[in-house]
């Protein structure tokens, strides 16, 4: 396809000096860890700049022609900021000018990201958090950004998610847009500024379900309420390929074909829900199918590939930097080949491996990736659950339930819930072991390929826990099974102290089967259309129910569900 934008995130170089915490928030540049109090630490700036140069060299050679950089808040000064903050911003501006100049010299277009709305106490006091003043402040910020950085191609705006609970520093973003009407007011102001400067506004439709705007990414009514009669050649919509985050087992969102605005479709190379690049999780076979589908989309003008951004984890490989992942780089390369050159997934993979390791048997590598695809789809996911379309309030329920980021959950709550949706339980157990056998075949093939067999052994040991856990989820419980699982986990933790967190708790949770059925029947639906009970109860009063849910989930769900990202509370807003 001849597209205008082959966009990739450029967040990885910033972590070369700041990923020494136990858990890393990969969703944003860790600005506070780059600073020395007065501004950017000069020594860290040198390291980041060198890594950035190498990164740009690699991705432009690969064929990407645009990058995204965090963020507008750290590049725009305001008179009501204290002098110390404006001096710090000035140091960022000087540093970013060097990055922008280098990227532009390499033929890259640069887009600066921003949330609506980034805040601190000075902004809050200045606007009083009145919508009209917030919009004016945002418009003024965009105008100053383009005035001071004329080489930028535009900005990328996120409205449906804000900074994680762990984000520290001079700015934290907050969700301020609650309705389609409010969203239109903000967009009109930003589009007006973009038109004045001939810049592009890339508006991301990603939402987490908070407030009435929270179903924008999948609900056509909300989508049209926001974008209809909002024509502009300077407005591009950026949409994820499905109705939820970067998971498998999704059909393409029909909203990609709605309306008349140009589109960028988002894909993920560093699989935040599938190991963060610690084992092979090839996206090519799925993305080839999506590419065929998107050939019929006349509004498509680009793709956006996430190669480092996304998720919270202690896995710290940096794409195209220190200890980069072969599997992430494979996905980065193959995604571009599939969409730009209409290359098949198999050919894209063999092109990549033959360039990286000349003389490699391409057919064997493809067989290896087919086995990896089977292992992920049939053991990492539980197919019978993953294919079900479930909705809670304004959110499409993810097709992956007992695994999240770098944590595997094995407990009675998960067992009770997952059994509600999986009825072919014996087959699920058997399918899991067949998929585990595929990893064993991968290990044998890896010995004949330029692949680190230790990575595949790590994958096998991780997937082995999942296979045995299925016996607990879907089989009859007995004490010997519990001991067997715990022996596996203990040995795994000993051999892989930096491996996945495995949280196992076999203590029974007391709630009746009839109660589970009633709760799910009330709260979940199998179609996107809202029911009467959704409109009258769940969409209006769920925030009042949340305190009760919080008491329940403190005893039954791991603490990371409360402490990472925006916290589970966002689903009830």
Language-model segments: residues:
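Substrate-binding groove of N-acetylhexosamine-processing glycoside hydrolases
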Residues: 1-10, 15-17, 48, 147, ...
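Active-site cleft segment of glycoside hydrolase catalytic domains centered on the general acid/base Glu
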Residues: 125-131, 161-197
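Short, internal active-site loops enriched in acidic
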Residues: 74, 116-119, 161-164, 207-211, ...
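Glycine/Thr-rich phosphate-binding loops of Rossmann-like dinucleotide-binding domains
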Residues: 77, 165, 247
